[in-house]
Amino acid sequence: MIVFLAVAALLVAAIALFMNRPEFGRAPRGERLERIWRSPNYRDGAFRNRHATPQLTSGKGWWATMYDFLFERKERNRPDHALPAVKTDLKALDPKENLLVWFGHSSYLIQADGLRILVDPVFETASPLPFFNRPFEGTDLYKPEDMPGIDLLVITHDHWDHLDYGTVTKLRDRTGRVVCPLGVGEYFEYWGFDPQRITELDWGEQAALGGGFTVYCRPARHFSGRTFRANRTLWASFVVETPSQRIFLGGDGGDDTHFADVAREFPNLDVAVLEDGQYSEDWRYIHMLPADLKRAVEDLGARRVFPVHNSKYALARHPWDEPLNNAAAL
């Protein structure tokens, strides 16, 4: 019994020490926490979706679902070859050219009317463990040092595949402003970013950047958390309005009424960036199934749709290229 208790104590201490690493960030505090408490989207100690959103829908429970994900046979959820990719010299791009460069999964660079926007950059392993959630072979072409100067860094939520400590800290001195959902700014402040350059938004809020540029924070149907405790920070979608463009950044999340709401508020969207991958019937409300994607595209009515959240990490059991085939069939 003494040996068992000693081993258990050592294990608990090791986990606590591991989770005290800076990558995990820290919980919101002070004035930021008081603002969170005042949010209409925060109730009973956690942020809430607009509609009831169970994270798991299989009825199997969290541990059984995780066991299936880790050990159930998966058909082609990772490619068996290096994926072909083109590496663009981002620093040589004409800053006046309107364009989007995708880095795989949910990381991409947008240039719109001279504004450089970097969204959810993750150029390393999408987990705190170096051997877990590694990128597919051939998809890790870009590194933080390849990025040009960034005017606006947008983070949609704090999950490991969207917010990476190693990436953003290496970009800190080349980033003009960070825009993120309420509570996520705590990570950036903890990681050494100037608080004056951090803009946190709740759903329904907006930030004028000057020069005809505005960022609007709107709902998403998802959840948050980098530790065992979920939903202490908000998750969101964003609309970036430039002098000539309206761009929807969907972030992560399941289908809901917010897509139609965004379309009514921002008609004639030029581009909608939508998640298309890492879905499962086991968590159908927090990631869109293929039929949900089709409905979201129709609800938004954007002139162009760019599907992301695929082709770099295996976070679900579906074949790795199925999301691409689904998008091509729209």
Question: Where do the protein language model's features map onto the residues?
Answer:
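Acidic/histidine-rich helix-loop elements
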Residues: P121-D140, F223-R229, S280-I286, A314
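Cap/insert and terminal regions of metallo-dependent hydrolase folds
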Residues: F4, A8-A9, I15-G45, L152, ...
